């Protein structure tokens, strides 16, 4: 899992894979609870197909405002610079489904423990 700093989302420019933004905060209990599960999910993904970026809303407040993040944890999925799907809450199965449902149909199923 990578991190976004200084409200910089230039990584969206040239990516040809799914990009998952995990909006979080250090003071958010549910965010801290799901963080290791998101890390494990991220580690199990093929980086050519999907990359996961953690975005601390306190460090990246302009970005959170621009993208209208209203709660944490929130997950935004981008493809070719466009927001294509999202979900909120500390539910790893929801996040897994968000990614799986948006991978190309030929993609093998992502398996999480």
What are these language model-derived features?
Residues 77-110:
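Non-catalytic, surface beta->alpha helical segment in thiol-disulfide oxidoreductase systems
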Residues 14-24:
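Short active-site neighborhood of thiol/selenol oxidoreductases, capturing the structured segment around
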Residues 3-4, 23, 35-38, 42, ...:
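Thiol-based oxidoreductase modules, predominantly thioredoxin-like and allied folds used
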Residues 66-67, 84:
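Chalcogenol-based redox active-site neighborhoods
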Residues 67-76:
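Structural micro-motif
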């Amino acid at each position: 899992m990578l991190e976004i700093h200084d409200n910089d989302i230039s990584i969206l420019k040239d990516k040809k894979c799914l990009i998952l933004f995990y909006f979080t905060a250090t003071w958010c209990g549910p965010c801290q609870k799901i963080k290791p599960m998101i890390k494990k999910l991220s580690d199990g993904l093929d980086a050519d197909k999907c990359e996961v970026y953690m975005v601390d809303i306190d460090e990246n407040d302009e970005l959170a405002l621009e993208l209208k993040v209203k709660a944490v944890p929130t997950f935004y999925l981008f493809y070719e610079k466009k927001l294509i799907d999202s979900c909120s809450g500390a539910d790893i199965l929801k996040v897994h489904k968000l990614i799986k449902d948006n991978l190309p149909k030929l993609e093998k199923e992502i398996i999480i423990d």
